[in-house]
Amino acid sequence: MNEICDTAVCMPDVQSSADTRQIAIDKVGIKSIRHPVRVADKADGVQHTIANFNMYVFLPHNFKGTHMSRFIEILNTREREISVENFEGMLRQMVERLEAESGYIEMTFPYFINKSAPVSGVQSMLDYEVTFVGAIENGQYTHTTKVVVPVTSLCPCSKKISEYGAHNQRSHVTVTAKTRGFLWIEDLVRKVEDQASCELFGLLKRPDEKYVTERAYDNPKFVEDIVRDVAAAMNAEPLIDAYVVEAENFESIHNHSAYALIEHDKRKK
């Protein structure tokens, strides 16, 4: 036996040893590792971006630890081929490789949409934070898409009581949707932006700035209005089985935010 083999034999595998505390671990793995990915782009076919991965598996009570290096190996063997289409396959590979009952992968990445200004038509990119969450439990795969959409909100009360003007601010609407099939990121973003006082743009000329200012003023909404209107849009989408809608207004006249949340599972009557 050569020296390398002798060394390997002599090195104890501590993580594979038994644990006597009789306590299982729901999720164990790695967090915050970045890797290049490909994402389906409705306009251009594919978009290359960098994702931040969290990867976990279930660990039975009788095992001391999991094989942390195997998570990295799964990412590295796929090089640049990670995409939405093979997301489930990668998750199943992870569960099989680590001999786990259940597994979870969270993939968070910036996604860019090319938008045209409302009057001038000048184009610019706007970024959105997107997270894909895949889970395998009892052999069943589920997929969840989470999108953070920045929008403008304008206060109806401020408009009503003021002789001119109204306070407005940037807001974040977060939709976490459990889907039964493929849903374009762009379509989910559009469903949110349509319910805001006004959507955001990366670049605006003066005629565009006038338009978005007046658009928001003519379409005032409380944080409660936004979550209800977005929830109604989620209810109307047949590809969405369940969702959580959150809205946070970064109040321009306060040092705190306004917040609202609606959670609904359409499969439950």
Curated annotation (Swiss-Prot):
Pathway(s) this gene product operates in, as recorded in its UniProt entry: Cofactor biosynthesis; 7,8-dihydroneopterin triphosphate biosynthesis; 7,8-dihydroneopterin triphosphate from GTP: step 1/1
Instruction: Name the Gene Ontology biological process terms.
Output: tetrahydrofolate biosynthetic process
Spell out the molecular function terms from Gene Ontology.
GTP cyclohydrolase I activity
User: What are the entry keywords?
Assistant: Hydrolase
Q: Which InterPro entries match?
A: GTP_cyclohydrolase_FolE2 (IPR022838), GTP_cyclohydrolase_FolE2/MptA (IPR003801)
UniProt EC number: 3.5.4.16
Residues under site feature: May be catalytically important: C155
Top-rank taxon, per record: Bacteria
**Class of enzymatic activity (EC top level):** hydrolase
**Coiled-coil features, chain-numbered ranges:** none
Q: Which family does it belong to?
A: Belongs to the GTP cyclohydrolase IV family.
The entry's function note states:
Converts GTP to 7,8-dihydroneopterin triphosphate.
Q: What is this protein called?
A: GTP cyclohydrolase FolE2
Organism equals Thiobacillus denitrificans (strain ATCC 25259 / T1)
